[in-house]
């Protein structure tokens, strides 16, 4: 969850207008002539080379690195994408790599195309009428353009009484972007990541061919693209499984000062039921967890937007009484419909769940909210941070999958070790996932154990010159894991060394990844910002 430059010689403005009109331009600022086939493309959209367009495509949410492209394509149809990629394949010596930018939410330039062509996918949705989101007549799935954002998929689905089963925490990401990574949130323990909930896709490969794929049709492309980091093609349509949408969510948080109790309860809430065939779970619809380091405990508790001032004061006092350097909180929901009887049943079911947990007595908190409001909860934080000028700051995030057998070691070494005594701005999230709900044939890489933890250290650099400290802190965390022999997998990361990518995927999956690259993007055109093949 989708989960992102130019120049000219003399006559920049005139050449830019010429390209937009589809007539030949002189070339780029490196002295490379525009291929005749590019200059002659009959595009419905616009290919822009002006500084406004290229500068906007040279940065991302991470706000750590930047790279100017040579041009930005604003497509008006999927035909524009086919035309661009077909020209790239048919032109000898084509010098431009191609990246597909959704909402620019990559962290380290993964959606950049330095000196190449960035495709602004949002333009595809802007040009579409009606919008490229359609719920099936039987309510079994929703078809969504790869450029569509999940908040719009939610709204269109709710209008028909249904909703996708698996989400991201933040809904203003594109369908194609998150499916190119995995797409995880607190529903993934029971439904798998978003990539496990895709029924069919339309993909334009690196050859410029539009291919419909599924588990039954062109299955190798289907599996490769899901979690494939944009290396094999661009998703222009995804068919996503949906379910009847609940109306409300009972939103609860339980507080712990003991990591063993915290993690055991998380696993209890997310474990498949015995005899359920691996697909039957307890009543909770969503389960995540948060870690609060004592140095910034009060601020971070308040920043959740969940706890009242009185709640924060009580939790801070609890930490003091127990001399706790870290506090943990399970966050969960139990979804239900609007009927009074359903609300009463939720009360009863929640009481039953509470009786099985080992949180600190008296430290269970709950709220009742609309289902859509819960799913869109992070957007309110975005609005608030934007007003304070704290949203568009560097985000040196570190996202990992840690095997269950080593999560206690991670807690001791990182939460109770490296992060102690540091200033932390941003949430620390940790929750278990079931490997059985992932399809290992897809490109996404996960640890080998049956249960592993998603760990998201979502740091923001808000103090002057703090970015370098946070980046070094991330390196210390990774060094600790390496030295401790923790077989983690990074998520949403960019490696710059081929051996790191081989380690990330594992030998067998890496060999398959290379095979699919050779088949579907042999010229190594796509998504150069991932630094896998470029």
Curated annotation (Swiss-Prot):
GO terms for molecular function: cytokinin dehydrogenase activity; FAD binding; oxidoreductase activity. Expressed in immature kernels and unpollinated cobs. Weakly expressed in kernels harvested two weeks after anthesis. It is found in: Secreted, Extracellular space. Competitive inhibition by phenylureas. Residues 65-245 form the FAD-binding PCMH-type domain. Glycans are attached at residues 52, 63, 89, 134, 294, 323, 338, 434. It catalyses: N(6)-dimethylallyladenine + A + H2O = 3-methyl-2-butenal + adenine + AH2. PROSITE patterns: FAD_PCMH (PS51387), OX2_COVAL_FAD (PS00862). Keywords: FAD, Flavoprotein, Glycoprotein, Oxidoreductase, Secreted, Signal. It holds the Pfam family FAD_binding_4. Its cofactor is FAD. It is an enzyme of class 1 (oxidoreductase). FAD binds at residues 100, 102-104, 106, 110, 169, 174, 180, 184, 235, 491, 527, 530. Trans-zeatin binds at residues 169, 381, 456. Residues 1-18 form the signal peptide. It comes from the Eukaryota. Catalyzes the oxidation of cytokinins, a family of N(6)-substituted adenine derivatives that are plant hormones, where the substituent is an isopentenyl group. Cleaves trans-zeatin, N(6)-dimethylallyladenine (isopentenyladenine), isopentenyladenosine, zeatin riboside and cis-zeatin, but not dihydrozeatin, kinetin and benzylaminopurine. PANTHER family: CYTOKININ DEHYDROGENASE 1, GULONOLACTONE OXIDASE. Belongs to the oxygen-dependent FAD-linked oxidoreductase family. This is Cytokinin dehydrogenase 1. It comes from Zea mays (Maize). The lineage of its organism: Eukaryota, Viridiplantae, Streptophyta, Embryophyta, Tracheophyta.
